[in-house]
Amino acid sequence: MSYQHIENLYKNQTILLFKECFVLEKIHGSSAHVAWNDGRLRFFAGGVSQLAFEALFEHARLKELFSALGHPKVTVYGEAYGGSQQGMKATYGDKLKFIAFEVLIGEAWLNVVNCVDVTQKLGLEFVAWEKVSTDLAVLDAWRDKPSVQAQRSGCGEKPAEGIVLRPLLEFRDHRGDRIIAKHKRKEFAERASGKDTEVDPARHELLVKAEAIAAEWV
């Protein structure tokens, strides 16, 4: 199962209804994942070479670690990055690597703290993360921080692609969709205008007022 599409914060501001959230560094690479299903290990390389991706892992040891978790079905989603991926060699180094950012056990998505716990038990690296206020100025500041992953890779201070925002516990909206958003720097904007990196304060104010009205009737 491929990883879900994440909407930009300017378009979906539901996460801002929470006072705090987790921010995770967004890595600029190719979406990939490792799956454990009833004793079988499977690798999904995304846009990188399947052979090169599988070579990143010690298969026998990884099977032991997945088995030790005690769950028949586990998927670790992440990013294959570095090397020739997305022209980011200067930021992440010249070697292909994998970093995790999400864990699905059965049909349950884990919150960030539990994702970190599982990936540590599997010996897999997890993206940089922090619990912060959902104040827009705070989120903009975190989005614009230098890439932690670049520093981990020994590449010095480089701009991060942006951040992914997730609630402290997993929640879904009224449509049944997970509450999650991405907030990217202008250098990595998906629209030429860069407007997808800017959140309209007026739209956010309407969202807050709507939530306050709803709370009056609960």
Feature map (PLM): residue ranges:
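Core nucleotide-handling region used for phosphoryl-transfer chemistry
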Residues: 1-218
